[in-house]
C-alpha cells in the first residue's frame, strides 16, 4: 500500500552557486558522508548534488511533513541497493516520522527515481508499506 508520494525539481545552477559560495560548509550541512563521497567523484558534481537535494525534498514531502517537525535535510540520504537502484536511508526525525506512518505488521520500502537534464534535476519518491516477511 502506498503511504506517501513526493516529487521535487531542483535548479542545478542554484546548487552550483551554493557550492561556489559556501563549499564544504554547504555540503557538510546538507549531505551525508556517502552522498558527498559519491558526488565528489562525479565529473559534474553540481548535478549529482542537485539530484540528491531534490531527493531529500521529495522524501520530506512523501513523509507528509516537508522540512518541519524534526525532519531535516541531513537526516535523509540517497544510498544505492546492491543492484545499483537508488533509495533513501533515513535517520533522526525523518526515521521517526517514517516509523509513525507505517501500519503495525508492515515494513516501509522507499522507491526513488532520479533524473537530470541541465539546468534541472528531478526526484520522485514513493513510500510503500508492505507486510513484514
From Swiss-Prot:
Q: Which reaction does it catalyse?
A: apo-[ACP] + CoA = holo-[ACP] + adenosine 3',5'-bisphosphate + H(+)
Q: Which InterPro entries match?
A: 4-PPantetheinyl_Trfase_dom, 4-PPantetheinyl_Trfase_dom_sf, ACPS, Ppantetheine-prot_Trfase_dom
Tell me, what does this protein do in biology?
A: Transfers the 4'-phosphopantetheine moiety from coenzyme A to a Ser of acyl-carrier-protein.
Q: Name one GO biological process term.
A: fatty acid biosynthetic process
Q: A single Gene Ontology molecular function, please?
A: magnesium ion binding
One GO cellular-component annotation of the UniProt record comes to:
cytoplasm
What is the predominant subcellular site recorded for this chain? cytoplasm
Query: What Pfam families does the annotation carry?
Result: ACPS
The listed locations are:
Cytoplasm
Q: What are the record keywords, sorted?
A: Cytoplasm, Fatty acid biosynthesis, Fatty acid metabolism, Lipid biosynthesis, Lipid metabolism, Magnesium, Metal-binding, Transferase
Q: Does the keyword Ribonucleoprotein apply?
A: no
Question: What class does this enzyme belong to in the EC scheme?
Answer: transferase
Q: Which domain of life is it from?
A: Bacteria
- Residues that hold Mg(2+) according to the record: 8, 57
Question: Which cofactors, by name?
Answer: Mg(2+)
State its Enzyme Commission number(s): 2.7.8.7
* Bilayer-crossing regions: none
Its name, as the record gives it, is Holo-[acyl-carrier-protein] synthase
Q: Which family does it belong to?
A: Belongs to the P-Pant transferase superfamily. AcpS family.
